[in-house]
UniProtKB/Swiss-Prot annotation:
Keyword Aminoacyl-tRNA synthetase found: yes
Classification via InterPro entries: aa-tRNA-synt_IIb, aa-tRNA-synth_II, aa-tRNA-synth_II/BPL/LPL, Anticodon-bd, Anticodon-bd_dom_sf, Beta-grasp_dom_sf, TGS, TGS-like
Catalytic activity: tRNA(Thr) + L-threonine + ATP = L-threonyl-tRNA(Thr) + AMP + diphosphate + H(+)
Key words of the record: Aminoacyl-tRNA synthetase, ATP-binding, Cytoplasm, Ligase, Nucleotide-binding, Protein biosynthesis
Designated name of the protein: Threonine--tRNA ligase, cytoplasmic
């Protein structure tokens, strides 16, 4: 783009009178290198190639000339207008980038996860262009996320972005969209990149640390913006029909509070305005359900800067926390798990043995004690390995299922901390199963049954995905992996649930099953995990006595042999803190009775009824019902309204009439007919009904 064109864009966007020097420098270098690229492209041999579509149809094309968008157009104009990205030989590919050889081709639109990711990534570049022109800022990173996209930037003089800036940013973005600026891809050497982004210390750091010397990577241009990016992108900015800035925040470069403070702007975009309106409706509902708001309004928990990332659970919040622990302990008891208690800190020698010190130490809190280095545990598995090894084990002892609610600490960057979903101090329903290879399938089936009961109780649906052996780096022999994967597949098939294969995405120490739950707003959360581990039993030299075969016994004169157990990592809730956040938003603060921190509120109609209210309160407390009594000076209607807003499951109004009949007037939170006037129930009967409802763990609030 020429200098005149740049000025034209700037003028049309906001009548900018001041040209931004680094923009022109970037464009001049881009134009020079693009000219060289086009000259080299012209020399590429044009040969006939076969392009195979997902349905098996083969289309003829020409190498270095035919593009995915031209293939889409040959099928239908509607398809060409709708698609956002191509998948060529399994890899994302720009629709306007020429195909280089015979290949497979898949075309994705916004409804495809990869298509949506590319759509939002391209939208992030539009946001980058808009903020750069708005604030003359130095851009940092601008990725797509699960819920849109964001861009981080450093702004001179410590300028902070506010809600008042949104309309200006959106105006620049809409002008860029209107101009249908093409996304242009260019490969540039590390040296060229350092020169192109010489003005931007954040890009300089990324280039220096992420790109090896002598290597190259890609940049993309749309309008005046050129950014370091691997792509791919939509053909042009006009594909984004609806664009909005959603929020802003401060962050730190690389998420580290020691680095520069940055401004982060979030956005959302869609291929049509209808989807934007639906999203805004969803957003309004999500805001009402935000666990941080509900936690504050219901006085469940809070955070304080004296201990970042560590939650203060207030009495009513602790009720939820302890109810979940009690529920999991009940499940453990009936499923053959044994609860253990392990230390919170260990000498680093343990973490060196487990491999965490080399691979995870930056996420651990460590300190020196008497010239020895120790670290707070970020996970329980090494400690459980020490337990397994503490005495001889026989195959008759297996499977050995151990559960641990120990406090864990992970040194998350302060900029990444977010309510209960990203914390530094937390507890997990962490368990490890040590079993023989032949027991893997039955143990996994047991985990599925566990999942089904717990998530069904919460009202969640869930999705299963099997991640198998990585192509290159993995521990153990192929036969062991193949057998383990076959057992996992058999267990998945027997579960009755649909599942997907994520080939090659397993951990290096074993295959895993990822479980994604869907909440009331259809949002996805990964909480549970089931992972097989061949590494830790090897690292800790874990072994058990296994019966020797007849041939082995004959050769050794011993009927026993030592062999390695398989270790299964298993969590259902995951972090209790994160699960409480998810449940808070899933129920919108209207807790099912069995889990509710406010099960009953007793409201005496006057001071004369206080003694009777206390009597009923004590009866309910002795029955292990969470009950509060409102003896405030508020009027009766005000007390009732306050209890309704606090989401008590039931309100018991008591006065002289109820005292004379040893009863309570019951109002049900979820029954509109009983909001203004409840029904009278004997205390003895209501206690029985409450206990029955609590035991049933029903999601329906009904006596």
């Amino acid at each position: 783009m020429s200098a005149a064109a740049v000025k034209g864009v700037q003028a049309s966007l906001d009548n900018l009178s001041l040209e931004i020097p680094f923009i022109q420098h970037r464009l001049d270098l881009f134009d020079k290198l693009q000219k060289e690229y086009k000259e080299s492209l012209a020399t590429k041999p044009r040969e006939e190639i076969d392009i195979t579509l997902p349905d098996g149809k083969v289309i003829k094309g020409t190498s270095w000339e035919t593009t995915p968008i031209s293939i889409a157009a040959s099928i239908s104009k509607g398809l060409a207008d709708r698609v956002t990205v191509a998948i060529v030989n399994g890899e994302p590919w720009d629709l306007t980038r020429p195909l280089e050889a015979s290949c497979t081709l898949k075309l994705c639109d916004f409804n495809d996860p990869e298509g949506k990711r590319v759509f939002w990534h391209s939208s992030a570049h539009i946001l980058g262009e808009a903020t750069e022109l708005s604030f003359h800022c130095h851009l940092c990173i601008g990725p797509p996320t699960d819920e849109g996209f964001f861009y981080e930037m450093g702004i001179d003089n410590g300028r902070v972005i506010t809600n008042d800036d949104y309309s200006s940013i959106e105006s620049y973005a809409k002008q860029a969209i209107k101009q249908k600026q093409p996304f242009e891809r260019l490969v540039i050497s590390k040296e060229g990149l350092l020169e192109m982004f010489r003005y931007n210390k954040y890009k300089q750091y990324i280039i220096q640390t992420k790109i090896p010397d002598g290597a190259s990577t890609t940049v993309y241009r749309c309008g005046p913006l050129i950014d370091l990016c691997t792509g791919p992108h939509v053909p042009h900015t006009g594909r984004i029909k609806s664009f909005a800035v959603t929020k802003n925040s401060s962050s730190y470069f690389l998420g580290d509070a020691k680095n520069d403070s940055l401004q982060r702007v979030y956005g959302i975009s869609f291929p049509d305005n209808k989807q934007m309106q639906e999203y805004k409706t969803f957003l309004a509902e999500a805001a009402k359900r935000d666990h941080r708001k509900i936690g504050r309004d219901q006085e469940l928990f809070f955070f304080n800067e004296i201990s970042p990332g560590s939650c203060f659970f207030l009495p009513h919040g602790a009720r939820i926390y302890n109810t979940l622990l009690k529920y999991m302990r009940y499940q453990y008891s009936k499923r053959g798990y044994q609860e253990v208690i392990t230390p919170n800190m260990y000498n680093v020698n343990l973490w060196k043995t487990s491999g965490h010190w080399n691979n995870y130490s930056e996420n651990m809190f460590s300190f020196d004690i008497e010239k020895e280095k120790y670290a707070l545990k970020p996970m329980n598995c090494p400690g459980h390995c020490v337990m397994f090894k503490s005495r001889d084990r026989s195959y008759r002892d297996l499977p050995w299922r151990v559960a641990d609610f120990g406090v864990l600490h992970r040194n998350e960057f302060s900029g990444a901390l977010s309510g209960l979903t990203r914390v530094r101090r937390f507890q997990q329903d962490d368990a490890h199963i040590f079993c023989t290879p032949d027991q893997v399938r039955s143990e996994i089936e047991g985990c599925f049954d566990f999942l089904k009961e717990v998530y069904g109780t919460f009202g969640f649906t869930f999705h299963l995905e099997l991640s198998t052996r990585p192509e290159e780096k993995y521990l153990g022999d192929l036969a062991t992996w193949d057998k383990a994967e076959a057992q996992l597949k058999a267990a998945l098939d027997a579960s009755g649930y649909k599942w997907e294969l994520n080939a090659g995405d397993g951990a290096f120490y074993g295959p895993k099953i990822d479980i994604t739950v869907f909440d009331a707003l259809k949002r996805q959360h990964q909480c549970a995990t089931i992972q097989l581990d061949f590494q830790l039993p090897e690292r800790f030299q874990l072994e058990f006595h296994a019966p020797a075969s007849a041939e082995e016994a004959k050769e050794s004169g011993n009927n026993n042999k030592y062999t390695r157990p398989v270790m299964v990592h298993r969590a259902i809730l995951g972090s209790l803190e994160r699960m409480i956040a998810i449940l808070t938003e899933h129920y919108a603060g209207k807790w099912p009775f069995w889990m509710s921190p406010r099960q009953v509120c007793i409201i005496p109609v006057s001071a004369a009824a206080y003694n009777y209210a206390d009597k009923v309160h004590n009866i309910l407390s002795e029955a292990d019902i969470f009950v509060d009594t409102d003896k405030s000076d508020n009027t009766l209607p005000k007390k009732i309204r306050n209890a309704q807003l606090a989401q008590y499951n039931f309100i018991f109004v008591v006065g002289a009439e109820e005292e004379s009949t040893n009863s309570v007037n019951v109002r049900n939170r979820d029954d509109p007919k009983k909001q203004s006037k409840g029904s009278t129930v004997a205390v003895e009967e209501v206690v029985k009904k409450l206990l029955k409802l609590k035991e049933s763990k029903s999601l329906i609030n009904d006596l």
